[in-house]
């Protein structure tokens, strides 16, 4: 529906019988009104056409084929000059067949039926509004007992029985004869009330405002009694009663605010869903497969017609038989709306539980959550996230299997433009065969197209961010660990969805506002949100720990160098290993990749003279002289090579490969920041 402010919204609630009939009724040119489903049939077994006035009737729900009636006549849809709009023979309207997705019908119930959601769901709305026990109302609804209506100056049951005794002297046969006459129906309807009709009468009588006022007065009185009496049992009883009164007042105010009549909780007309929402399809071998709701509708129509026959005919029917049939109609409608709510669910011939209307709409796979609220969208995928430590902050790794599906239309367009494929079919076959040209075009497409990553629940705007995708091996999405906190995700099996923005506006928004390197601060408090996590800090610690004892320890001892404190060393096989010297960090990293040194192995790295590492008052630990007159001054963490004239020739610092890697990463990050700053200014 659309309100006065033109906001589209969906409201779920009870509907009046007039509204139900307005949804379904159509007036034919001959004045006949169609919309009521009276027959429990679906398709004719010979012609395979919908039965007239059945659950798939074309007069009620529209044609199966657009513009073709049940007779086979054809009219152009949308041509107003074509007259008439309905077929004169079969009464089918010449419209699009998509009308069968929303055109409804209805079943006119022979007796009122209580809506089981309002009766059996806890808390029971009917029990709350009438202030009666639920078991008492259930006994009344299912005709287990009845109550007498207030009468005034009308013949009672005893007086009527006396009139029969005057005609038939034998009291033994007078009462049974009275219960089998047609006059008993009039008497029962006037003085005895049972079934859902009795509930409807009680819901129509009270004034909602009076209910609200009386409940408020009682709630205040109970509050005073609870404060005066100190009995714990009585206090609990009063507390439960006060909670019930609050629910009753809220329910009455809701009916007043929404202008809904409480008697609508009792059904007189049962809506019939459009046929496309409860289809009958043919599987392999021509065997039909029907929705469970069709079988439940047929059950309702069968029992309703069985009850309608004795009520419309002139012959007399025992009252107990009528009450029993009303109970069967009530149970059939209950099964249609919510199978199993009253105990054992109804099953088919294969002992499979029928799927009722409640089962269709509720739950994760229901109509609302699957197709309306959380429905799946095109150009999207989902997979587990893992750490991508080599990724940049604004990049994410997409598996090839996901990427080729997300960007398949773009790849097809690229194959056709490069004349690799002449049509869409050939392009799809090349994609299925995974030819090398496909991955090349995919790389080109992904370079200029950002993707959106989302982790549910999206509680703030950082729950969905944009990234530049790159192809990775495997089946998991790779993510930089620093963006984890914004998504509130963990790398322990969490899943994230990936979406492709299609329009230029969406792509511009993703690049300008949603990229991860542009969302470094929390939108709530302004604190940095991309901060190192504990595992990152531990990794940096292991990377830079090196030899904590420094040069004063036995630097040639392998157990000190590798920090294996619990490892036993065989001193008989001990050999003195000299710490290597490297002219540049590239040489040191190359030696590490060749596995000539370890990550924490101490080494000497040549340092530039313009970067000072010399402490003015530091005394060398050791001085080593060479034959040519040069000498080495060894300090705690560096070494100076001097000439004969005491000039500094070069400087070496004592470090590890881990320190070198960490230093280079920081240096590159600072240089990149400076370049970006200069570019912006």
Swiss-Prot record:
SMART domains: RPOLA_N. Keywords: Chloroplast, DNA-directed RNA polymerase, Magnesium, Metal-binding, Nucleotidyltransferase, Plastid, Transcription, Transferase, Zinc. Zn(2+) binds at residues 69, 71, 87, 90. It catalyses: RNA(n) + a ribonucleoside 5'-triphosphate = RNA(n+1) + diphosphate. Binds 1 Mg(2+) ion per subunit. GO terms for cellular component: chloroplast; DNA-directed RNA polymerase complex; mitochondrion. Its EC number is 2.7.7.6. Its main location: plastid. It is an enzyme of class 2 (transferase). Its cofactor is Mg(2+); Zn(2+). One of its GO terms (biological process) is DNA-templated transcription. It is found in: Plastid, Chloroplast. It comes from the Eukaryota. The keyword NAD does not apply. Mg(2+) binds at residues 490, 492, 494. One of its GO terms (molecular function) is DNA-directed RNA polymerase activity. Belongs to the RNA polymerase beta' chain family. RpoC1 subfamily. DNA-dependent RNA polymerase catalyzes the transcription of DNA into RNA using the four ribonucleoside triphosphates as substrates. HAMAP family: RNApol_bact_RpoC1. In plastids the minimal PEP RNA polymerase catalytic core is composed of four subunits: alpha, beta, beta', and beta''. When a (nuclear-encoded) sigma factor is associated with the core the holoenzyme is formed, which can initiate transcription. This is DNA-directed RNA polymerase subunit beta'. It comes from Liriodendron tulipifera (Tuliptree). The lineage of its organism: Eukaryota, Viridiplantae, Streptophyta, Embryophyta, Tracheophyta.
